[in-house]
Amino acid sequence: MGANAVLRKRALEDIATTGTDPETGASHRRYIQDRTVIEDTESSVDLVKRGWQLFNYPARLSYSATPPDFGALVIQRRRWANGGLLIMPKLLGLLIQRPLRRRSPEAFMRVHYLTSIAAVNVGLVLLFLFPFTDWLANEWLPLTAVAYFCLYAHDLRLAGYRRLDLFRVYALNLMLIPVNLGGVFRSLQQAVTKRTATFGRTPKVENRTAAPAIYVLAPYALTAYLCSAAGFDLFEGQVFPAIASGINASLLFYALSTFVGWRDSAADIVRKPRSRLRAGA
């Protein structure tokens, strides 16, 4: 399921649970467990566990407002990145109980959907921060990403965008690495503390939504690091790693200037320290 779905009432009845309000003592039925902030994803696993089938309709059923600024986007994407790891044990239990032999592609897609945000973003950070010089120097390595980017560009084209928008999307995804990791960290925090994370609703306000300073500073720090890594690799004669770091740094620089803006990013960075100084005074 997603933000838009058509459900059968019998299906909801099958996954419903009965609970008691701790304050009033009244009993109630809960159809969506609301254990994570991506409750629709967990409900889809519950439906499959009960033997129901889910069908994807590859078209827009409705339109949702796009986050107007980086601060609102941070809230949305951090929420989307939170919950997949928490649902994974339930999915693995389902796969163990009911081996999906003929539905192995479905199992692969479900596992990938729940774990990809954590795996991809952690993998990118490791790739950026640790010197895999001999591996990156292999000229065949860039070809491994060609199929992925070709399919990505094809999907963008089918959705009505230009294929060249692929570079803008990739730049945005680079800038969102700290945000996605923040959502993954909240999943781990909930797993340890057993406290359900607060649902951060995407703001729909006229004024700009300020972004937490950490999510603005981190892309700047990563850009500076990639620039220095490109210079160091070039000095050492490592051409392919230098090109890769230079391209990623350039795309991050573009993302910061286009999707955040220099003035707004500066305002977000100094906003909290100033408020603390005033409060202390």
For the regions a language model picked out, list residue spans one by one.
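Membrane-embedded multi-pass helical conduit in multi-pass membrane proteins
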Residues: 113-195, 210-278
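Juxtamembrane inter-helical linkers in multi-pass membrane proteins
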Residues: 83, 191-205
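Non-transmembrane catalytic domains and loops of membrane-associated enzymes and transporters
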Residues: 1-159, 163-166, 170-180
